[in-house]
Amino acid sequence: MMDSFAQDWPTLTHTDNGLAMDQLSGVVGGGDLPGDVGFEPQTRARSNTWPCPRPENFVEQADELDSTKASNQQLADSQQAIQNANAAKKNSSRRNAWGNLSYADLITHAIGSATDKRLTLSQIYEWMVQNVPYFKDKGDSNSSAGWKNSIRHNLSLHNRFMRVQNEGTGKSSWWMLNPEAKPGKSVRRRAASMETSRYEKRRGRAKKRVEALRQAGVVGLNDATPSPSSSVSEGLDHFPESPLHSGGGFQLSPDFRQRASSNASSCGRLSPIRAQDLEPQDLWGFPVDYQNTTMTQAHAQALEELTGSMADELTLCNQQQQQFSAASGLPSQPPPPPYQPPQLQQQQQQQPSYSLNGPAPGGYQTLQPQSQSQCLLHRSLNCSCLHNARDGLSPNSVTTTMSPAYPNSEPSSDSLNTYSNVVLDGSSDLLVQQQQQQQLQQQQVKVEFEGQCLEVLNNEAQPIDEFNLENFPVGNLECNVEELLQQEMSYDGLLDINIPLANVSTNAPLVSLVNNSTTLSSSSSNLSGSTTTLSSSSLSAAVQLNQLQAQLQQQQQQQQQQQHLQQQQQQHHQHQQQLLLNNNNNNNNNNSSNSSLDLATQTAATNLNAARVQYSQPSVVTSPPSWVH
């Protein structure tokens, strides 16, 4: 048994799919099945859909070719017959079931046949039923819904018909023919978003306006052609209401597209952004390496007009500043320099601010450029500007800085006061000149301090804690607090005065200002507290009123209940009285009946007694009469 397992196993001649392996080996060319012999990769069609593609060497039989040709000929004949039928149908004189006229033509005939040339909707229906044979048997409500709906649609969609309000109340409107309608086939009304004649007129007017601007010699415009879907090209969008339009408008960038540039809208607008972004400039008009090559003289003049009109609307005008300085006892200070257009400031581009280190003779040094990035109140000791100036301070130099807010004013003397112990090299004449200069500068410090205060009060962006009030000479300074508060409260009733108490010195004017501001804030808090109390009192009054109303309602309900109880008691009392009366009547009747019965019994008794007496008497025998025998 084990030897039989050691023998070679017989090879299968068939696979699972029933294909003989010897036949497959004969097709391949050998008894074995090498994996790379006889099987070549075949190309496969990209679309393997039904019906399957025919092989390349397929030959059609003759009968199949004849049948295919016959079927193709029949199909061509049927298509030709259908085309002939369609042509005959198009040439027919009857386009609709009632004739060649459309609904709009029938309505036109109906309105034209009227004496007043106007008909109501019901009259149009009646004319259709009476004059068109097709609608004579379709006048009832069941069969007239379709064609009446078509008439209403044609009346509302065609331009040749217009609706006129009827004079009488509760009557339908009149339908008339529009005399301004175009002859021929009437055009249906479109939606408001589609391009109609009204939008075409607007587009024409806009193009004429652009041509007029071109002929007027407007400079700085792009050469782009107008877009067919927009009223104005991207490079020709101007703003006539702008004050800058008088001398030539801003140039728009060619990379900006329209906000709505589809074909369905012809009123596209452009974003009002300038073509070239301006670099940020200094706060007081110092340009930072910017050169405008497209700015013209007319444009600069327009900018000056704009800044002049804007300067008139500033909160602190020159007159108010003069009043403030007159009330405070300080000398008047000219306002900051006006804004100059960039073209006129090109000469000042390369002019940085300077720290004045005295002149060359007598030990003074030459002018040295100083950094432009200084804070608005750079005179305080906490400012980085003076720290930078201290590092470069030498015994032969006296550092004085110029305020960026007042470039034309004299240099300030804060550093001179701070560093008064600097030893100066030179003769006594230079010392005298220096003392005189210090006196002049000390007089001008007050004026500059007033301007600085005004700038800080009106500029919320600059924090007020940059002040170092201890370093300012406040010997002769005065402040009219009432006028200042009126000035602040005049701006839409907003009062915002924030002065930290830690930085305020013990000087009387500043302390009085702080006291007044704190008093005002306390009064405002008292006012808010009073308003809160008033609101709470109003709420309590409302609650009390609601309670009183509830009590009144309860009292009314109690009164109604009491009245109802009283009515019930009265009814019950009346009922009892009625019962008593009925009982008395019954008693009287009983008494009368009893008395009559007693009388009857008494009479009967007397009669009986009388009878007894009669029967109790002895009988008397009488003799018969004489004639009785």
Curated annotation (Swiss-Prot):
CDD domains: FH_FOXO
Region of interest called Disordered, as start-end residue ranges on this chain: 185-208, 220-274, 321-368, 394-417, 563-597
Residues of the DNA-binding region: 98-204
InterPro entries: Fork_head_dom, TF_fork_head_CS_2, WH-like_DNA-bd_sf, WH_DNA-bd_sf
Composition bias, Polar residues: 224-233, 259-268, 394-403
Keywords: Activator, Cell cycle, Cytoplasm, Developmental protein, Differentiation, DNA-binding, Growth regulation, Nucleus, Phosphoprotein, Transcription, Transcription regulation
Pro residues biased stretches: 332-341
The keyword Phosphoprotein is assigned to this record: yes
Cellular component aspect of the GO annotation: cytoplasm; nucleus
Biological process (GO), any one: glucose homeostasis
SUPFAM superfamilies recorded: Winged helix' DNA-binding domain
PROSITE patterns listed in its UniProt record: FORK_HEAD_2 (PS00658), FORK_HEAD_3 (PS50039)
Functional note: Transcription factor involved in the regulation of the insulin signaling pathway. Consistently activates both the downstream target Thor\d4EBP and the feedback control target InR. Involved in negative regulation of the cell cycle, modulating cell growth and proliferation. In response to cellular stresses, such as nutrient deprivation or increased levels of reactive oxygen species, foxo is activated and inhibits growth through the action of target genes such as Thor.
Quaternary data: Interacts with melt.
Protein name: Forkhead box protein O
Native source organism of the sequence: Drosophila persimilis (Fruit fly)
